[in-house]
Amino acid sequence: MLAVKPIYDPTLREELCKLCGAEYKPDSYAYFAADVNGDATKINFIIGICTFRMKGDNNVIETLKQAPGVEDEEALVIMARAVMNFMYRAGVENVRLDPAGTDRNTAEKLGFREAKDMTINLSEFYKAPCKYTD
């Protein structure tokens, strides 16, 4: 079963960044995705991490990476969407994806396009996320 959770503890955030090959930045936020047992009381394995920054007009998904040996792009997309939803509910209008932080295929599945400077207007996105083309 998939679990996606924010990482509040900075030490754990740093450890999971290291595990997934993401740069640790103390001022960034992060979510992790994990495979958990049926009642969600035990982590079977870490799937990946998503680090992001929310500061004024500088709202960026910095990293979206899988743990070594894990190939679950669907879980990465779900985790990134959870981060985007959190940002939207926090009042963020636009979010940019750092293209160095994930692969192009995953970025496109999330709706980020180079032609749009890898930026999504979250208000427009959440009007119809399955039809978002802007």
What are these regions (language model features)?
Residues 1-26, 131-134:
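Short amphipathic alpha-helix that is part of the acyltransferase structural core
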Residues 27-31:
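Short loop/turn microsegments at loop-to-beta-strand junctions
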Residues 35-74:
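Conserved donor-binding loop and adjoining core beta-sheet/short helix segment
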Residues 71-85:
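Conserved acetyl-CoA-binding loop-helix of GNAT-fold acetyltransferases
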Residues 85-88, 108:
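Non-catalytic positions within long, well-ordered alpha-helices that form the structural scaffold/packing
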Residues 87-100:
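Conserved GNAT acetyl-CoA-binding A-motif
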Residues 100-117:
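Conserved active-site alpha-helix within GNAT-family acetyltransferase domains
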Residues 116-134:
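C-terminal "cap" of GNAT-fold acetyltransferases
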